[in-house]
């Protein structure tokens, strides 16, 4: 994919026609306290905050209301998700409920096919995305790095896709770099790495490959200092994006001198 593509410029991140000044999205669960979450949001300045409808509807009235107040205080757009859904209809119903509760057409589509790995249901995900798009949703689908799956999601109308780097919460970083780089080369839509990043260097790496944004939760929330880690990731995302725009040198199999040979003795010119 050429550097001349409009997507590869210093312009802000654009998703479904809306622009965002940040290329980092942040999850809202597992933080030590609400105050720590708010401080992490303030430090990271994310484009969006993800929130689970299931988590809030199951929390009870007072706790749920407290969370809504927290989101409002953060003053960051909310991206509701369908976390915990295992069937196509369950995901669609949850998305429709989230639209009413959060008053937004944005939805992070999660359709889980395996409880152990939390791997997406790749067979039903495109159909779920298609139905939601036809219902007026702006769908950001959580998926694997499989090229055929991601292409199918684009074909049904997804204007961005969210492949994982590794299973959710593992913090391993990109486990299949070749597939992820191939995905970037082949798809001309925004790609947001959704899961599996554990270190700021992981985020920097995928941004250097040309990915458009990253979504983080566990890596920040479970850090010893979540606020400092939020800042580290924000800096890493920006550094990786800047490096991609700058155009990195190509790796070589043999050593190349970094100083000129002009003026050195002729017997050294072999």
Segments (PLM) and residue ranges:
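Conserved SET/PR-domain catalytic core that frames the SAM/AdoMet-binding pocket
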Residues: 17-23
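Alpha/beta enzyme core
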Residues: 10-15, 29-48, 61-78, 85-270
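Long, charge-rich, low-complexity intrinsically disordered regions
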Residues: 2-7
């Amino acid at each position: 994919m050429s550097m001349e593509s409009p997507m590869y410029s210093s312009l802000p991140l654009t998703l479904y026609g809306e622009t965002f000044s940040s290329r980092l999205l942040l999850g809202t669960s597992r933080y030590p306290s609400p105050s720590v979450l708010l401080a992490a949001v303030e430090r990271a300045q994310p484009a969006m905050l993800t929130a689970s409808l299931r988590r809030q509807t199951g929390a009870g009235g007072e706790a749920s209301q407290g969370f809504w107040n927290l989101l409002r205080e953060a003053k960051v757009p909310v991206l509701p998700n369908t976390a915990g859904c295992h069937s196509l209809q369950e995901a669609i119903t949850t998305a429709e409920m989230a639209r009413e509760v959060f008053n937004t057409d944005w939805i992070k589509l999660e359709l889980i096919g395996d409880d152990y790995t939390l791997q997406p249901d790749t067979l039903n995900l495109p159909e779920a995305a298609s139905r939601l798009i036809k219902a007026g949703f702006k769908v950001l689908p959580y998926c694997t790095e499989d090229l055929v799956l991601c292409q199918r999601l684009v074909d049904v109308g997804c204007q961005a896709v969210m492949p994982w780097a590794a299973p959710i919460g593992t913090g391993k970083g990109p486990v299949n770099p070749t597939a992820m780089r191939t995905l970037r080369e082949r798809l001309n839509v925004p790609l947001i790495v959704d899961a599996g990043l554990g270190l700021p260097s992981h985020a920097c790496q995928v941004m250097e490959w040309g990915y458009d944004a990253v979504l983080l939760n566990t890596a920040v929330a479970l850090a010893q200092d979540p606020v400092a880690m939020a800042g580290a990731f924000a800096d890493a995302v920006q550094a990786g994006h800047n490096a991609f725009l700058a155009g990195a040198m190509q790796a070589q199999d043999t050593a190349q001198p970094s100083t000129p040979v002009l003026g050195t003795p002729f017997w050294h010119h072999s």
